[in-house]
Amino acid sequence: MQNKKIAHIVRIEMFEEKIDRLDLIFTKYVEYKFPLYLLGKLWLYKFIRRKFNLIGPLNEQILSPYLQFNLYFDKSKARKETFKVYLGKIGFVLLHVFYLSCIAYYDSFLYAKVMNDWLEEVMRTRY
């Protein structure tokens, strides 16, 4: 009976500690680091866009009526180039989603290890 009470108390303490740890991880990564990471990526992307001029000229080529009079302007080639740019953008986003999911996957293992270490420590020191 005494062992059951101790086990119940340990379970309650573990649950409370788990909630605290989850809250800590959430505030550390999701609320603080992730928005900063996204802002950094957007800031970087602004300069990449400006350097390689990804958005402007290709769409303007298709939309601009004056380019229809250019003998060397090939509409299908411009469409292909625009398509390549959009594929690159989609690939860029998907790569980052994959990267972040890998980090989350690794963190879940790390979290489990931390919880196991903590439980072993609790069982050693308290009981």
Curated annotation (Swiss-Prot):
<keyword id="KW-1133">Transmembrane helix</keyword>
<feature type="transmembrane region" description="Helical">
    <location>
        <begin position="85"/>
        <end position="107"/>
    </location>
</feature>
<keyword id="KW-0812">Transmembrane</keyword>
<keyword id="KW-0472">Membrane</keyword>
<dbReference type="GO" id="GO:0005739">
    <property type="term" value="C:mitochondrion"/>
</dbReference>
<dbReference type="GO" id="GO:0031966">
    <property type="term" value="C:mitochondrial membrane"/>
</dbReference>
<protein>
    <recommendedName>
        <fullName>Uncharacterized mitochondrial protein 35</fullName>
    </recommendedName>
</protein>
<keyword id="KW-0496">Mitochondrion</keyword>
